[in-house]
Amino acid sequence: MAKDVFSVAIFFIVLRETLEASIIVSVLMSFISQTLMDKDGNVTDPKLKRKFMLQVWIGSFTALFICLAIGGGFIGAFYALDKDIWSGSEEIWEGVFSLIAVVLITVMGFAMLRVSHLQEKWRKKLMKSIANRKAKGISNWGKKYSMFLLPFFTVLREGLEVVVFVGGVGLETPATAFPLPVICGLIVGCLIGYFIYRGGNVMNLQWFLIASTCILYLISAGLMSKATFYFEMNKWNHQTGGDAGELGDGPGSYPFKSAVWHVNYGNPEMNSNGGYMIFNAILGWNNTGTYGSILSYIIYWLFVAFIMFLMWYKERRAARLLIAKLGDKVVDLEAASSHTPVQSSSSEDEFKINSPTDDKGDKAIDIVTEVRESSSPVEEHKDDKTVDVINEIRESH
């Protein structure tokens, strides 16, 4: 029979976890390719690109090896001791790994949105993180191996879930129904990630960054909600004495005291709900909404929106201040070139420059960020390029 050869439940379990991991890894690889690419589509530093791609692959395969070892140990203990030692801590594992992924994805998303303005600067930062081999401390280590950490924790979390969930399903599934759905799930998930990677390489950089960041934040917001729900379910399972979420959709399968709403269908923990399992992996769907999971989802988006507004405001404000400070230098150069006296002014109002916008504003923001992140004084950045940008902005007003 077909069910003895191909288990649909195993296929969707593997596809769900592979899909989430492949999306994050493919977006990260596209980010590296786009950052180290010039306007003509040529790689500016092939050696640096290979090093960071290698970090991504090493992080992914290291996590895969670890999760196979840990997951295999849990499954081996289950069959040897006839006791599912994973079930007592499953939600804790998932919740902790989800929170780690949320932090890493959120930080990466904020960084990616600035790449279009600071592509060359990001290339230099990536180069420094590799070159600074003598740097010590956790912070420097994290920067140096940043492209290793995100795929490592992502693949570790997803891979561990695959091994344990597939092992759990295997209790009621013939051994012959394992290989084909696992292979097919891995292939389909990896193919989707590959197409995202290829699409990210041919897309316009700005559109790619916006689209990929939106996808990452959708996944991250779902992970935030799921992490909260995992901790709530861990408490509920200890109160009920079992894994209540996998017993069905009715009363007793969810913490009803903290539930805001619940529907008796679409439970992503049920292996027969393949489509809802995919929604759970990408968007964080759950058929039960608790106060904690809903509030954490909303608070996460409010936090992201606040940080983005703060970044936008600080860049615009810094641009205005820098333009005002460079005003005297621009005026002096204009006076020298035209041999006509020009009244100098250093105040922002007298200089009559509003907040930069559009392309000229982007150029000013590049300079502002370079000055702000540099340890040298502002006066050292008054080069011809800066003066040209200031002149363009003045002429537009």
Curated annotation (Swiss-Prot):
GO terms for biological process: iron ion transmembrane transport; reductive iron assimilation. InterPro entries: FTR1/Fip1/EfeU. One of its GO terms (cellular component) is Golgi apparatus. The modification Phosphothreonine is found at T340, T357. Residues 349-364 have a biased composition (Basic and acidic residues). One of its GO terms (molecular function) is high-affinity ferrous iron transmembrane transporter activity. Residues 337-346 have a biased composition (Polar residues). Pfam families: FTR1. The modification Phosphoserine is found at S337, S338, S346, S347, S355, S374, S375, S376. The keyword Ion transport applies. It is a multi-pass membrane protein. Its main location: membrane. The keyword Membrane applies. The chain crosses the membrane at residues 61-81, 92-112, 177-197, 292-312. Residues 337-364 are annotated as: Disordered. It is found in: Membrane. Keywords: Ion transport, Iron, Iron transport, Membrane, Phosphoprotein, Transmembrane, Transmembrane helix, Transport. Permease for high affinity iron uptake. Belongs to the oxidase-dependent Fe transporter (OFeT) (TC 9.A.10.1) family. This is Plasma membrane iron permease.
